[in-house]
Amino acid sequence: MKHRALHPIAIVLLSISFAHAEDWPQWRGPSLNGVSTEKNLPVKWTTEENIAWKLSMPEWSGSTPIIWRDRIFLNVAEGNDLYLWCVDRTKATVLWKKLLGSGNVKMRKQNMSSPSPVTDGRNVYVMTGTGILKSFDFAGKELWTRDIQKDYGAFGLNWGYASSPLLFEESLYVQVLHGMKTDDPSYVMRIDKKTGKTIWKVERPTTAIRESPDSYTTPGLLRYGKTTEIVITGGDCVTGHDPATGKELWRANGLNPENNPSYRIVASPIIFNDIIYAPTRVRPLLALRAGGRGDISTSHLLWSTINGPDVPTPVTDGKYFYIVNDRGIMWCLDAKTGAEIYGQQRLKPGTYSASLVLADEKIYVTNEEGLTTVVRAGPKFEVLAENPLNDYCLSSPAISDGQIFIRTATNLYCIGKK
């Protein structure tokens, strides 16, 4: 497997870790926004054609595989138990499996393996929907373990916990935004990645009611100038926090203008350069300018749209902003102004839950039947290919070293050249 030199732009994008462009170290990839700098990626495939290998999986999951060089890590449910798998990328074999805990529960599109692992290239960190958070080295040695529910109380989300940790420098950032099944406050916490100890834990207040405090999103990382902030969406608002202390620096309301009691949020915040894009339950999606303090609901609002997604997280290259809703309707907007470039273009009918990824001037969109539509990036809607895997799929694609990895209910596929 060849390794490419890093483009200077990629160094800026990937400064959150030591990852190379060919790695996919966390759910939304090397730049934390679903964008990869990879080139010459596969465009067409079937279950038998253009498949480098496939590995049998015991269960479906919303968790995305993460990749570092020749290692792939997966959060896996096997019956009642939950495991971290380490897979040899070159041999398509399981190197080791480590038990994370038991108590797997299935709830519609959710089970307790939904959070994706993260890695810094030395160790891997994984959380389960049951609140178990563990660290392992690449040989499978357990370094530390936490039980977040035991420490801070039971999770109270209607559909179970699904947020992935955010890894930044020497810390993990974990959010627990809930309210449907608990009166306990929502919170955000920072954990030392070396020891597993809590550095800080702050409450995140909300006026959202019933199910609307619940958030299945993953924290985002905003970097502009010399400033770094942790971005959290849920509970009818989006907030920015100081990584050093957890202090809330700014807040934008408006994600639930009608105070709908069932406005839980699934799609995660997208950050590109100095713009924060905050989806909610379809409408509205807000675009906010970085740099604000206090209430920025109006002062830093760049644009909004009523044509947001529910489950799939959108993607942007900084020029165009791409949205696919749960029914497979696609929009392209101007990323800076929100002006519609094209709208209501229908992909193949189906239900869409996986998040969009963008690479090689293409957008990859996978539906729940395992069909990936490849759309040319740019101002003109053009479908390049429709690629069926004919299997249940909730997991988002991962891209690494010229190959695409898609996890279905029965297989992990490595797509591309062997």
Residue ranges and their predicted role:
Residues 1-5:
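Positively charged n-region of N-terminal signal peptides that target proteins for export
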Residues 7-17:
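Bacterial N-terminal signal peptides
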Residues 20-418:
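Noncatalytic, solvent-exposed loop/strand surfaces
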